[in-house]
Structure formats: C-alpha cells, structure tokens
C-alpha cells in the first residue's frame, strides 16, 4: 500500500498548478507528503475536516475545507480514515 500511496502522491504532483500534497491517518499521523505540505502540517490538516463535519446536520455530507490566500488554495477532504490535502497555486 505504501508504494501505491507514494505513486498517487507523485502523480498528483505532476499537475503544474499543484505544489503540495499530504495524506494523513485519522490520528493525524502523516502517511506521505510531497512539495509544500510536510509532516509538520499533518495534525492540523487531519482535524479541520472533523470540525467542518460538525457544521452540517447531514451525517452523509463530506465537506471540503478550502483555505484561500492571494497565492493559492489548500483543499482538504476526509475519505474514510484518511485525510488528503492538496496545495494549488492560483495563476
């Protein structure tokens, strides 16, 4: 599984507008990262979708947390027990 995850991270980074990607487990431990997102971001990245899910009354909703700045956007979404963050620059 680790090799498959690393391959997915590398494939994601091939998009020229993506400058970082991070995958964490449900405990906030980094499972893999590339580019601008590093292991030190794993805890914060993993908790944000959990808080966002508390803002909806529909338990089947899967929120996407978007952190925007003048330089880009970080999109974060939880999938089962994994959380994925993608850092994309704006052109």
From Swiss-Prot:
Main location: cytoplasm
Protein's cellular compartments: Cytoplasm; Lysosome
Disulfide bonds: none
Taxonomy, superkingdom: Eukaryota
Cellular-component GO terms for this entry: lysosomal membrane; lysosome; Ragulator complex
UniProt keyword Cytoplasm, yes or no: yes
Keywords: Cytoplasm, Lysosome
Pfam families hit by this protein: LAMTOR5 (PF16672)
Any one Gene Ontology BP term: cellular response to amino acid stimulus
Protein family according to the UniProt entry: Belongs to the LAMTOR5 family.
Subunit annotation: Part of the Ragulator complex composed of lamtor1, lamtor2, lamtor3, lamtor4 and lamtor5. The Ragulator complex interacts with slc38a9; the probable amino acid sensor. Component of the lysosomal folliculin complex (LFC).
PANTHER family linked: RAGULATOR COMPLEX PROTEIN LAMTOR5 (PTHR13342:SF2)
Role this protein plays: As part of the Ragulator complex it is involved in amino acid sensing and activation of mTORC1, a signaling complex promoting cell growth in response to growth factors, energy levels, and amino acids. Activated by amino acids through a mechanism involving the lysosomal V-ATPase, the Ragulator plays a dual role for the small GTPases Rag (RagA/RRAGA, RagB/RRAGB, RagC/RRAGC and/or RagD/RRAGD): it (1) acts as a guanine nucleotide exchange factor (GEF), activating the small GTPases Rag and (2) mediates recruitment of Rag GTPases to the lysosome membrane.
Name the record gives this protein: Ragulator complex protein LAMTOR5
Organism whose genome encodes this protein: Xenopus tropicalis
């Amino acid at each position: 599984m680790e090799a498959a995850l690393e391959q997915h991270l590398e494939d994601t980074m091939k998009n020229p507008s993506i400058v970082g990607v991070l995958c964490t487990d449900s405990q906030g431990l980094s499972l893999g990262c590339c580019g601008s997102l590093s292991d030190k971001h794993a805890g914060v990245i993993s908790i944000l979708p959990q808080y966002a899910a508390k803002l909806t009354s529909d338990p089947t909703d899967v929120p996407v947390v978007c952190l925007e700045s003048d330089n880009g956007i970080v999109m974060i979404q939880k999938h089962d027990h994994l959380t994925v963050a993608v850092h994309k620059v704006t052109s």
